[in-house]
Every structure is written in C-alpha cells, then in structure tokens.
C-alpha cells in the first residue's frame, strides 16, 4: 500500500474574494461606497503566505470566532507537471497550454480560515494570514469543468457538518 504523503504548496497561493454568488450578493450593497464606489470589474485576489500552510490533519490553533472556507484549489502547470502534482510537488510557475491559457495540473481540497472582518476590499493581513490558516488536502488529478461544477464540498468539524460549498454557485 502506498501511503499518502502530507502536501503543502511550493509556490504562491492566490485566493479569490467574492467568488461565490451568496458572498457577492451579501457585499453588493457596500460596493457603491468609498473607496471604490463600484462593483469590481476584475477578480479581487488575496495572497496566502507560506506561514499559513498546514498539512491535512494538522492541529491548528484558532481563536473564536473564525470563518471556515472550504474550497477547491487548482494547481497550475503544464501536463509534464501532472506527475509531480500526483507525487505531492505542485509547480509554482504558471505555464501556458497550446491555447495560451494555464493548464490545470491537479486539484486540492483546502480549508481557507480567516477571522471576521468588516471589509473585503482591505482586510488586514492578520485576519487572513495567521499560522496554519490554510489547511491543505492531498492533490488529485485534474477534473473537467463539468466535473468541477458538479462538486459540493462538505466541511465537518468533530464529525458535524458545518459548511457546504456548491461549486455551481461560483460567480462566472
């Protein structure tokens, strides 16, 4: 039997904000307020720093309250990097496929923790980038767009389901 090795990202991790329709709808009334006075016209991204990475099964100290963020991470790379992703080594560089778009080398379940904050536009780093606040599962082979859209992610804490994320509700 081949044991599953713990995996952590070897490159930069970017997270999208306002990526689920319910989040976008929740924050829509505030989008017309300063400082931006309009809805975003491009993806709003944030970076998870290396100190946030925690392996699957790790004990993470979380102050109350904490926001849980079950999500699916996409490992970016070309087809030659797929074997590395399966072996637990994600490639950090973004390589383009034949159509000029990045190729998805694999997928990984993530729990993106954060502390509650009043603004998506400028949350202090200390709310998102605390030690262990990105719990990483084990990478798997890439999925098609249809397979991804059909997924639901359930997050359980102490055996109790506390969050369900339906990927069909992503903002397109």
Predicted regions and their residues:
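Glycine-enriched loop-and-adjacent helix/strand subsegments that border the catalytic/binding cleft
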Residues: 4-172
């Amino acid at each position: 039997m081949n044991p599953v090795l713990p995996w952590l990202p070897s490159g930069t991790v970017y997270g999208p904000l306002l990526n689920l329709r319910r989040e976008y709808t929740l924050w829509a009334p505030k989008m017309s307020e300063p400082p931006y006075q309009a809805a975003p016209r491009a993806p709003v991204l944030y970076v998870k720093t290396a100190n946030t990475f925690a392996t699957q099964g790790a004990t993470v100290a979380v102050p109350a309250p904490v926001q849980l963020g079950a999500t699916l991470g996409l490992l970016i790379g070309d087809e030659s990097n797929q074997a590395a992703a399966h072996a637990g080594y994600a490639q950090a560089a973004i390589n383009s496929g034949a159509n000029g778009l990045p190729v998805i080398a694999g997928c990984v379940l993530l729990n993106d923790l954060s502390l509650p904050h009043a603004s998506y536009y400028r949350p202090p780093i200390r709310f998102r980038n605390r030690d262990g606040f990105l719990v990483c599962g084990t990478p798997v082979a890439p999925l098609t767009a249809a397979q991804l859209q059909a997924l639901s992610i359930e997050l359980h804490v102490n055996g109790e389901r506390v969050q369900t994320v339906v990927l069909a509700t992503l903002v397109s």
